């Protein structure tokens, strides 16, 4: 499973959305109807899965699925 697939699977599970709705351009709030609690839980799950901490400042910048994928790729390299 690719990083992109892993991230999308986590988002589907955490937000209860359809896999077809999770695109790199999807906004968590506008397109996937996430609220602040959803986003906090999503960040915690991503931190656990990928074994690094996401600062509050960084988390605020992660607005789309693509933002998260790019952020994790940068942290892993």
Curated annotation (Swiss-Prot):
Residues 1-76 form the Carrier domain. GO terms for biological process: lipid A biosynthetic process. Belongs to the acyl carrier protein (ACP) family. Pfam families: PP-binding. GO terms for cellular component: cytosol; membrane. PROSITE patterns: CARRIER, PHOSPHOPANTETHEINE. 4'-phosphopantetheine is transferred from CoA to a specific serine of apo-ACP by AcpS. This modification is essential for activity because fatty acids are bound in thioester linkage to the sulfhydryl of the prosthetic group. Keywords: Cytoplasm, Fatty acid biosynthesis, Fatty acid metabolism, Lipid biosynthesis, Lipid metabolism, Phosphopantetheine, Phosphoprotein. Carrier of the growing fatty acid chain in fatty acid biosynthesis. GO terms for molecular function: acyl binding; acyl carrier activity. InterPro entries: ACP, ACP-like_sf, PP-bd_ACP, Ppantetheine_attach_site. It comes from Chlamydia muridarum (strain MoPn / Nigg). The modification O-(pantetheine 4'-phosphoryl)serine is found at residue 36. This is Acyl carrier protein. It is found in: Cytoplasm. SUPFAM superfamilies: ACP-like. NCBIfam families: acyl_carrier, PRK00982.1-2, PRK00982.1-4. Pathway: Lipid metabolism; fatty acid biosynthesis.
């Amino acid at each position: 499973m690719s990083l992109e697939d892993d991230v999308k699977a986590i988002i589907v599970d955490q937000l209860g959305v359809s896999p077809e709705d999770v695109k790199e351009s999807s906004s968590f709030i506008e397109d996937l109807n996430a609220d602040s609690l959803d986003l906090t839980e999503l960040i915690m799950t991503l931190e656990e899965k990928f074994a690094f901490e996401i600062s509050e400042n960084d988390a605020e910048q992660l607005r789309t699925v693509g933002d998260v994928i790019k952020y994790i790729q940068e942290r892993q390299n």
